[in-house]
Regions:
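C-terminal cap of metal-dependent C-N hydrolases
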Residues: 40, 397-445
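Alpha-helical scaffold segments that flank or form the walls of functional sites
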Residues: 53, 83, 100-152, 158-173, ...
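Active-site metal-binding motif and surrounding structural segment of the metallo-beta-lactamase
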Residues: 66-84
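Active-site gating loops and adjacent loop-to-helix segments of metal-dependent hydrolytic enzymes
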Residues: 98-130, 206-207, 234, 252-270, ...
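Histidine/acidic residue-rich metal-binding segments in metalloenzymes
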Residues: 162-176, 190-298, 315-338
C-alpha cells in the first residue's frame, strides 16, 4: 500500500500538525499541552499536538503546532496523524519463520509445534534456507517500521554454528537499517555438558545473549546455577523462556529470579512468556513477583503466540488467553514489554513482523486500554531499555528521526484499522514500505 504522505527528499524539513503520544516523548519534565478533546471522562488519550523539525537525520526541535520559525523550510502537513518512534521487537524467532507452507502444525498445540520444528530443522535448515527466511522476516520488520530486533536462534550442536554465522552476516548486511541482536535457544540441560560452554563461547564471540528454555525438572536448580555461572564468566546478558504453559505448578521464573539474587547478577535478565502466572493463586503470584522485582528481572510477553497455543484442545473452546499478568507485573514495578514472537511457523501460523499489530492485538488480548496510558512504551522504549539500546524508542530533540507516521488521528482510529498506508521515516528520509512477496520463498517450500 502507498504511504499516505510524501516526505521531501531534503535534509531539513518540518512535520507539521502531528499528534504524539505523551508517553513516547523523551523529555517528560516539560509541560506538554495535551489535546483537550481527548481528555473527556471515559475517553482519555494523552496526545500532544506538535510540529517536529527534522534536520540531518535527527529531530532538531519540537514545538506546539503553529509556533516556531518555519520560513523557507519545507513543511509537510501530517493532518493530525499520530507520530510514533519506530518499533523495537525484542523477542522473535527468525530462524523458524515462514516455514508454515512446508511444515504446518497439524493440531495447533505446543507439542505439535515442537515436533514440527524438530523435523523441519533436522531436514531443511541449511545455510541458504535459514538466511533467506531470516532476511524475509527482516524485510517485513523494516517495511512496517521496526528499528531493532532480537531473535532467538535454535542452537543445538552444528545448528548453532550455522545459524549464528547467518546472523552475523545479516547483522552486517542490515547495519544502519535494523539493529540486530541474537540469543541462543536450547533447553537448560544443554549447559550441563561441555557443549554448553562451547555454545556460550559462540554466543560471546557473536556479541550475543545467553538464552534457553527452562522446564520444571528435578535438576532445574543446578541447570539455572550453571547458566548464571556461564553468563558471569562470559559477561553475557540473559534472555530465557520461562513457564510457557498453563500448568500452575510451573515456577521456573521464580527459580531464575532467586538465582539472580543469589548470584548478585549485574547483567540484564529478561524472561519471556511467564504464562503460568495467569492461573496461579494470589499467594504464589506474590512470591514470584516479589522475587522478580527484587532481582531486577524484566518480562517480555508474547500475547499473539500465547493466545494461539495456550489452552488449545481439539473440539474445545479455550477458556484462558494464556497471557501473563502484565498489569500486575507493571504495577509492582517490573519492566515489561510485548513482542511478536514466532511468525508463520508451527508456533504461530500468522503474523507479519509488524509492531503495530503486536500493540493492537496485545491491547485487545490483555486489556491494555481504557486508558491506553503508557502501554505504547511496551513496543518502543521499554524493549529498547531492556535490550540496552540507547536513544531509541522515544521522540525528543537530538534523537534520531526514526519515525512512524500514521493517518490515524487517535488511538481509537489507530487500533480500528490496519494502517497499511503508514509513512516510515528512517534517519530523516522516507523509506519504501513495500513488503516482500511471499513468492520469494516458494522454492524453499
Amino acid at each position: 500500500m502507498t504511504s499516505f504522505l510524501q516526505i521531501p527528499a531534503v535534509s531539513h524539513y518540518w512535520l507539521c500538525n502531528g499528534r504524539v503520544p505523551l508517553t513516547l516523548l523523551a523529555d517528560q519534565t516539560r509541560r506538554w499541552p495535551l489535546i483537550e478533546a481527548f481528555q473527556q471522562p471515559g475517553y482519555r488519550e494523552d496526545l500532544v499536538a506538535l510540529d517536529i523539525e527534522v534536520r540531518d537525520g535527527k529531530i532538531a526541535d519540537l514545538q506546539p503546532i503553529g509556533t516556531g520559525n518555519k520560513a523557507d523550510i519545507p513543511a509537510v502537513d501530517v493532518r493530525s496523524g499520530l507520530i510514533w518512534p519506530c518499533f523495537v521487537d525484542m523477542h522473535t524467532h527468525l530462524d523458524k519463520g515462514h516455514i508454515w507452507p512446508r511444515r504446518a502444525n497439524a493440531d495447533g498445540t505446543f507439542n505439535g509445534a515442537l515436533e514440527a520444528v524438530r523435523k523441519d530443522s533436522t531436514q531443511r535448515w541449511q545455510a541458504e534456507d535459514v538466511y533467506r527466511r531470516m532476511e524475509f522476516g527482516l524485510k517485513c520488520s523494516y517495511a512496517h517500521g521496526t528499528q531493532a530486533v532480537r531473535t532467538h536462534l535454535d542452537a543445538n550442536g552444528a545448528q548453532g554454528e550455522i545459524s549464528f554465522e547467518i546472523f552475523r552476516q545479516l547483522r552486517k548486511a542490515w547495519a544502519g537499517k535494523l539493529q540486530l541482536q541474537a540469543a541462543c535457544l536450547v533447553s537448560l540441560d544443554y549447559y550441563m555438558g561441555p557443549e554448553g560452554e562451547n555454545l556460550a563461547d559462540l554466543v560471546a564471540s557473536s556479541t550475543g545473549v545467553l538464552g534457553g528454555v527452562a522446564y520444571m525438572n528435578p535438576e532445574l536448580a543446578q541447570q539455572i546455577e550453571r547458566v548464571f555461572e556461564l553468563a558471569k564468566e562470559k559477561n553475557l546478558d540473559l534472555d530465557l523462556h520461562t513457564d510457557e504453559s498453563l500448568d500452575p505448578n510451573e515456577i521456573t521464573l521464580r527459580y531464575v529470579a532467586e538465582a539472580a539474587i543469589r548470584h548478585q547478577f549485574t547483567g540484564r535478565i529478561t524472561c519471556a512468556h511467564c504464562c503460568s502466572l495467569s492461573v496461579q493463586s494470589d499467594d504464589e503470584v506474590r512470591k514470584t513477583v516479589e522475587a522478580v522485582k527484587a532481582a531486577g528481572v524484566t518480562v517480555v510477553s508474547l500475547p499473539m503466540c500465547n493466545l494461539y497455543l495456550q489452552d488449545r484442545q481439539p473440539g474445545r473452546t479455550p477458556r484462558h488467553r494464556g497471557v501473563t499478568i502484565l498489569h500486575e507485573l507493571k504495577a509492582a514495578g517490573v519492566k515489561v514489554a510485548i513482542a511478536s514472537d514466532n511468525c508463520r511457523d508451527p508456533f504461530f501460523a500468522y503474523g507479519d513482523h509488524d509492531g503495530l499489530e503486536v500493540f493492537t492485538q496485545s491491547a485487545r488480548i490483555g486489556h491494555l486500554d481504557h486508558p491506553i496510558a503508557d502501554w505504547p512504551q511496551a513496543i518502543t522504549s521499554a524493549p529498547a531499555e531492556m535490550m540496552g539500546l540507547e536513544n531509541m524508542g522515544q521522540i525528543g530533540e537530538g534523537w534520531g528521526a526514526d519515525l512512524v507516521v500514521f493517518k490515524a488521528r487517535s488511538f481509537n482510529e489507530l487500533m480500528a484499522r490496519g494502517q497499511g498506508d503508514r509513512t516510515i521515516i528512517r534517519q530523516g528520509r522516507q523509506i519504501d514500505p513495500t513488503l516482500p512477496d511471499y513468492a520469494e520463498l516458494d522454492d524453499l517450500m
